């Protein structure tokens, strides 16, 4: 997920999201402890970028540092593309992106409700398999499970 606040771009990882009914709405879990969430709540804009399998290690590493301290686009060599409906950038290395606006926030549950306003697809991307977080430091890339727990040990809650 990418955000932008007065030209300062950031990208964060999200491990849980879901489509909602038959509207272009998406529910996503995050909260005010997160730098990107605070930016998103201020600007009311996000881009959901859809990474593919070869980006998985980069995605995991993005989730281990804060955009308050690191320019993640520079640190992880990501290329920004301008969005059409929102200020947050698209990520050129991704397969697709959804430009979104915030329509609701359920604070008690850290649940952000987004509405997609535009979809972008990268037709030049050869890799089409997308990444899915399992929730314990392991990931699936369209059926293949890949274990990156060692990179996430500090971020995982006790007992996971």
Q: Can you say where each PLM-predicted feature lies in the sequence?
A:
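Basic, polyanion-binding surface patches
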Residues: 1-160
